[in-house]
């Protein structure tokens, strides 16, 4: 069986299983097994698929049919043009979160500063920001030790030196230092949300997704605590659910933040809300 036929059959299986991107999933999985990119697959589609690699590929397709995320199956995900290692201990970086990086860069025009990423996971946000602002000191924290180890390894593999990653339950392990910009993509899904039973999120850590009855528990905690760690004039920017923007703005305003505003993601949904402390 040649590569084109193998991909076509796999894509059909994935489509029947409910994948929203069956051909892409198949190409990414086969490219991973063969150690090639998707362009190579298009160019050499008439080549015979090696038996051993074919067996490995079909095992991955079977796992994907069961719903396992592609990023976990191949152990990597691209974010902001950076290739990041992933694991089941962390949330899978998503394209919409690049909106938070874009906002952070707009809020950080200076050559130097101090940046904090709360709940860093793979280190995606911290590393994307650090790659664009090499003069900034970038800190990422996560309460999961495996996540901190993974983020550290990603920084090393990408040769991004202006970062450090610490184990901390939100701010608990930080000293009296202050930051010019604090960002977070915290858990913001309500416990009863039916989407938790669908798609990739079924396999992602619940601790990175769920935040109480209304999904706002961690956002409230961050808003209340961040002021003590922001330098004068510093910003707090947070990702949240598309239907939470108004409530997050209210929480920021009630806590005393200024210049509160929400920004939209790639789909046109309000996804990031920010506020500033007094100078």
Give each language-model segment a name.
Residues 29, 67, 97, 125, ...:
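Residue-level signal for inorganic ion chemistry
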Residues 83, 137, 162-164, 258-261:
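Conserved beta-strand segments of alpha/beta enzyme cores
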Residues 188-218:
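Mobile active-site "lid"/loop adjacent to the S-adenosyl-L-methionine
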Residues 213-276:
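Conserved Class I SAM-dependent methyltransferase catalytic core
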Residues 28-106:
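Conserved AdoMet
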Residues 95-198:
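Conserved SAM/SAH cofactor-binding pocket of Class I
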Residues 71, 189-192, 243:
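Active-site beta-alpha loop architecture of Rossmann-like, nucleotide-cofactor-dependent enzymes
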Residues 1-40, 49:
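Non-catalytic accessory regions of SAM-dependent methyltransferases
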